[in-house]
């Protein structure tokens, strides 16, 4: 079996009237099938614990799929049933960062992943 990889593109999106609101993600991740990856989304310019953080997936040529969301204030989560066994959402309040961990990666996980407030 030849070497293969999975490419995950990370994009942040924020809504609101204040231009200083930012969600920052580190960029492209290159991982091997079967591995796990933890994607980060660092928030700034607003009170992190006051807004739910959403994660969305988009495969090439396809529409957006809502993965789930997390309440940074209390850690409460909601998941799309499709992703429940694939994804774990967490936050670190001290660094105002949201995370999504994807496990047992396959070619179907190669996509653009958005975090959105």
Swiss-Prot record:
Region (Framework-2), start-end ranges: 55-68
Signal peptide: 1-19
GO MF, any single term: antigen binding
Matching Pfam families: V-set
GO cellular component, one term: immunoglobulin complex
SUPFAM superfamilies for the chain: Immunoglobulin (SSF48726)
Annotated region described as Complementarity-determining-2, given as residue ranges: 69-85
Keywords: Adaptive immunity, Disulfide bond, Immunity, Immunoglobulin, Signal
Disulfide pattern: 41-115
InterPro entries: Ig-like_dom (IPR007110), Ig-like_dom_sf (IPR036179), Ig-like_fold (IPR013783), Ig_V-set (IPR013106), IgHV (IPR050199)
Region (Complementarity-determining-1): 50-54
One Gene Ontology biological process: immunoglobulin mediated immune response
Region feature (Framework-1): 20-49
Annotated region (Framework-3), positions in chain: 86-117
CDD domains associated with the record: IgV_H
Note: This germline gene belongs to a set of closely related genes that could encode V regions of NPb antibodies.
UniProt xrefs under PANTHER family: IMMUNOGLOBULIN HEAVY CHAIN
Protein name: Ig heavy chain V region 23
